[in-house]
């Protein structure tokens, strides 16, 4: 299987998001990379499902709460910028203050 660097990145994010979901199910608080991966995966999959940029910007800020991440993680992440493929092309989605 020959994957482009972008496809490899998408696959890595998807796998990290799966690990993060399993940890949340067990009640384990997420670290920085896990939180980023989970929110990124949510936006990428939402774009694939046909949701709008504005909708994903808003919804992406409600994927995780402060109680679901390790102490200090919410303060470390001010914005997440995700390049996602929508039905009408690739767009940049910025989620402001994603962990509230």
UniProtKB/Swiss-Prot annotation:
It catalyses: urea + 2 H2O + H(+) = hydrogencarbonate + 2 NH4(+). Pathway: Nitrogen metabolism; urea degradation; CO(2) and NH(3) from urea (urease route): step 1/1. InterPro entries: Urease_gamma, Urease_gamma/gamma-beta_su, Urease_gamma_sf, Urease_subunit. GO terms for molecular function: nickel cation binding; urease activity. It is found in: Cytoplasm. One of its GO terms (cellular component) is cytoplasm. CDD domains: Urease_gamma. Pfam families: Urease_gamma. HAMAP family: Urease_gamma. Belongs to the urease gamma subunit family. This is Urease subunit gamma.
């Amino acid at each position: 299987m020959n994957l482009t660097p972008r496809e490899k990145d998408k696959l890595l994010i998807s796998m990290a998001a799966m690990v993060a979901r399993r940890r949340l199910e067990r009640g384990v608080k997420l670290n920085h990379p896990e939180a980023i991966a989970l929110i990124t995966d949510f936006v990428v999959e939402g774009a694939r499902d046909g949701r709008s940029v504005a909708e994903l910007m808003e919804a992406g800020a409600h994927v995780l709460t402060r109680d679901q991440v390790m102490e200090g993680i919410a303060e470390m992440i001010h914005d997440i910028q995700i390049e996602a493929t929508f039905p009408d092309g690739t767009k940049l989605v910025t989620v402001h203050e994603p962990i509230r």
